[in-house]
Every structure is written in C-alpha cells, then in structure tokens.
Amino acid sequence: MTKENICIVFGGKSAEHDVSILTAQNVLNAIDKERYQVDIIYITNDGEWKKKDNITQEIKNTDELVINDVETGEISQLLSKGSLGKSYDAVFPLLHGPNGEDGTIQGLFEVLDIPYVGNGVLAASSSMDKLVMKQLFEHRGLPQLPYISFLRSEYEKYENNIIKLVNDKLTYPVFVKPANLGSSVGISKCNNEEELKSGITEAFQFDRKLVIEQGINAREIEVAVLGNDYPETTWPGEVVKDVAFYDYKSKYKDGKIRLDIPADLDQDVQMTLRNMALEAFKATDCSGLVRADFFVTDDNQIYINETNAMPGFTAYSMYPNLWKNMGLSYPDLIAKLIDLAKERYEDKKKNKYKIDY
C-alpha cells in the first residue's frame, strides 16, 4: 500500500506553545505509520520553522520534538514537498492559541493550496475570539451567561467606569479571560473587586481584549463534533475537578481532574446538548473537529460556554476520549480527520476562480 505523506506542524508563537508540543507527541505516537509517512515542522517561540522528515520512532519525551539541530527553513519550500517526493496529502496543524488556532496559519495553507486538518480561516478565527464567538452564538439563539467585553486601551482610559459596569451587571464570582487564548491561559476566577482588578491586569498581559463572564455553580459538560457538511456528535462527557477552577495547571500539570464519559445526565438533556453542539458548529461555520463546552445547572438549565476549534489530544484530553466511547479509536480518529481534510479540499476545487466572458 502506498503511504500518504502527512506533515504535522506544532509549537508556535503562543503562550500555548508547550501544550502544542504535548499534543504533537500524543498524535505522533498514535498515528498509523503503516498508512502514513509523517514529517514534522516545529515552530519555535521566535517563529522559526524547523523540519524533520519521516518520523518513525516513538516520542518518549516532548524534548525530542524541540528541534534545534537543523537550519530554519523557508516556509513555502518546507510545505511544498514531503519526504515521499510529492506534495503533502494533508498538513495537520496542532497549534493552539494565536498564530495557529486563530485562522492565521489556516490562511497560509489556503494561499499555498494545501489540504489541512481542522477548521478553515473563518471558523478558526471566530472560535478563537471569545467575543465574536459569543455574538455568533447569540445570533443563533444559543443560551449564554451574561458577559462584558472591553479593550486594554478602554480600560486604561475608563478603569473606574468599567469596574462599576462589572459590579452593576454581574455578580461575583466572575471569570476574567483574554479574548484570544485557550487552555485556560491568563484566566482568573475573581470573588471580589480587588481580585477583579488583579485578574484584569493578569489577562491583559496576554491579549488586548478581555471578556468577563458571570460565574455559575454548574457542571462542566463537553460534546465532541466531527465532520464537514454533515457532522456527528458524541454523547456528552463531564469534567470533574478536585480544584475550585479548571485552570492551565490543573489541566496539564497536576492531573487534578477526572473525565466522566459518558456524563451522568438525563437522556433528554444529553440529546439537547448534542443538538446545541451541532448548532454551535454551524454558527461558526466549522469543519473537521470542534469541542463544544457547556454549563449544566442542577435544574438542567443549559448554557453554552465556548467552542474549541483545535481541542487538545493529550492524555487528559476530552475530545479523543469522547470518540473512544463512541467506538472510534485514537488512530482511527486521526485518520478520519485527515480524510475530512482531503474531502474539504476536493470540495473546494469545485469552485470557479475566474469568470468566463
């Protein structure tokens, strides 16, 4: 059987750089190397692209993926041809956060006319920006918790007015979030005005725009979505925490979470969550994969929190485990995502790019 040549891209200029490397390690160890010949491109924190061909060995430590012993390559040349001597069948970007999950690199792949796994430019960018995402959800009629958003420049000029607005519109606790980061980077749970000001200062280190959301005592439920024009969903899973707030440290370092799959919910609530996940997928014009995150209260009120256009594939990650519960193994999930990338690319080729006069 002729192998398909795949390129996995990871790292990147983002606060989620290390998460991306961890995700790449997991995917490289799971991908079917009998079916795929896998090259890798590591993007350093400084934005340099470094490539290695035909990765066959198990990656035992993430340090093995920090490539320093090759020269920085010219981007279009690195992506133009794989180690099998032909164009890549697909590129698999495993980049989290700005410059990778936000539509930036997806635009590059579009310009270079390369099939790639995951969401397109519009879906990636709108799912990355929490304010834009919330506005699209609102237009679709999806229930959300109250929130406030503002820019760093606005806060510098109108700090007192903004603090008053938060105190008037929301009740503590609230969550302060950079608008364009994931993996809970820069997020703070604030129980009073002093913590609010500290959380705002922290979040503005990572982004020029913030979202402050109403806190709620609710269960955190997640649904995985997979597909292009006709997506499928999983049964919901629940994030059960041994900490007050599911932050970056508890997600990736401490292991202080448990994933209950499937979640212990009434059947009708589970079906509502699956349908809402599909609506969220459509609201941001997604393709490939999405994880939709929800809050569910004790009386089964449901609020959508966000969609994640590039959910992690680490050992702690909900997305692959949700599909495993549906009978789709990790290697088969990776293969399905690559097939979806090629399917979308072939569909795009049906478009006309010139007008016949």
Curated annotation (Swiss-Prot):
List all disulphide bridges recorded for this chain: none
Q: Where does Mg(2+) 1 bind?
A: 293, 306
- Top-level EC class: ligase
- EC number(s) per entry: 6.3.2.4
Q: One GO BP annotation here?
A: peptidoglycan biosynthetic process
| Residues reported to bind Mg(2+) 2 | 306, 308
GO MF, one example: metal ion binding
Recorded catalytic activity of this chain's protein = 2 D-alanine + ATP = D-alanyl-D-alanine + ADP + phosphate + H(+)
Among InterPro entries, the record links this protein to: ATP-grasp, ATP_grasp_subdomain_1, D-Ala_lig_Van_CS, D_ala_D_ala, Dala_Dala_lig_C, Dala_Dala_lig_N, PreATP-grasp_dom_sf
The residues the entry assigns to the signal sequence are: none
Give the metabolic or biological pathway.
Cell wall biogenesis; peptidoglycan biosynthesis
User: Any idea which UniProt keywords this protein has?
Assistant: ATP-binding, Cell shape, Cell wall biogenesis/degradation, Cytoplasm, Ligase, Magnesium, Manganese, Metal-binding, Nucleotide-binding, Peptidoglycan synthesis
**One Pfam family this chain carries?**
Dala_Dala_lig_N
Q: Where in the cell is it found?
A: Cytoplasm
Ranges for the ATP-grasp domain? Answer: 134-339
Domain of life (superkingdom): Bacteria
Which GO cellular component terms are attached? cytosol
Cofactors, names only: Mg(2+); Mn(2+)
Q: What is its biological role?
A: Cell wall formation.
This one is known as D-alanine--D-alanine ligase
Species of origin reads Staphylococcus epidermidis (strain ATCC 12228 / FDA PCI 1200)
